[in-house]
Amino acid sequence: MDLNPSTFVLEIVNFLVLVWLLKRFLYQPVSAAIEERRRQIARTVAEARDTQTAAETLRMQYESRLADWESEKRQAREAFKQEIEAERQRALDELEKALDAEREKARVLIERQRRDMESDLERQALRLSRQFASRFLERLAGPEMEAALLRMFGEDLAAMSPEQWQALTRALEEQEHPEAEIASAFPLKPESCAELTEMIEARTGRAVAWRFREDPALICGIRLRAGHRVLAANVGEELKFFADGAENSLGGG
């Protein structure tokens, strides 16, 4: 076909009109749709990233919480274990104290029973020894032994200290009419009685009303009683003194 200027201009105009139409009715809507789609995709990606970040944060929080929970469980188990151990130790300590107390009570009881048994045996031995000594001395007792005890009594009187004589003198002075008693297991000879009474009256400076009597409980020997003062040299009272002293010693132990 022939290309003339007017046709060329017309083609250009048609082309420009077509371009305008395409741009107006096709390119702009498509561009707008593409831009909207791009923005939607960007929003979706941003939301996905936010979701991923939130999920990662939640995951980290969950893992941290799990770690904290495990730590708390370990601490709780350790605390519970320590509490159980402390309670067990406390129970063991209380049991040990109770056992110690029971052992001490048993020891004290056994010791008391042992001491009581020993005391009973010693008392029995003392009673038997006293009975044996009494029977033995009763068989040996007689005027000869009593004469020996009387001499010993006289020697003891002669050897008394001034303080002892003063005590005997006061015992006589406390009486309105001084009296004294001499008891013996066997009858005393008159000269022996006179010797004793003269010594006492001379040393005390007092005239005394004397009584003489026999007392088989003395077994053998003599006893002088002046007021509250008693002087003796006899088997019976010596045995009683020995037995009473031993009993008191056992009772005090």
Swiss-Prot record:
A Pfam family: ATP-synt_B
Topological category with respect to the lipid bilayer: Single-pass membrane protein
CDD domains per record: ATP-synt_Fo_b
Any one GO cellular component localisation term in the record: plasma membrane
Top-level taxon of the source organism: Bacteria
Subcellular location: Cell inner membrane
UniProt keywords, alphabetically: ATP synthesis, Cell inner membrane, Cell membrane, CF(0), Hydrogen ion transport, Ion transport, Membrane, Transmembrane, Transmembrane helix, Transport
Transmembrane spans: 9-27
GO molecular function, one term: proton-transporting ATP synthase activity, rotational mechanism
Function: F(1)F(0) ATP synthase produces ATP from ADP in the presence of a proton or sodium gradient. F-type ATPases consist of two structural domains, F(1) containing the extramembraneous catalytic core and F(0) containing the membrane proton channel, linked together by a central stalk and a peripheral stalk. During catalysis, ATP synthesis in the catalytic domain of F(1) is coupled via a rotary mechanism of the central stalk subunits to proton translocation. Component of the F(0) channel, it forms part of the peripheral stalk, linking F(1) to F(0).
Quaternary state and interactors: F-type ATPases have 2 components, F(1) - the catalytic core - and F(0) - the membrane proton channel. F(1) has five subunits: alpha(3), beta(3), gamma(1), delta(1), epsilon(1). F(0) has three main subunits: a(1), b(2) and c(10-14). The alpha and beta chains form an alternating ring which encloses part of the gamma chain. F(1) is attached to F(0) by a central stalk formed by the gamma and epsilon chains, while a peripheral stalk is formed by the delta and b chains.
Family: Belongs to the ATPase B chain family.
Protein name: ATP synthase subunit b 2
Provenance organism: Methylococcus capsulatus (strain ATCC 33009 / NCIMB 11132 / Bath)
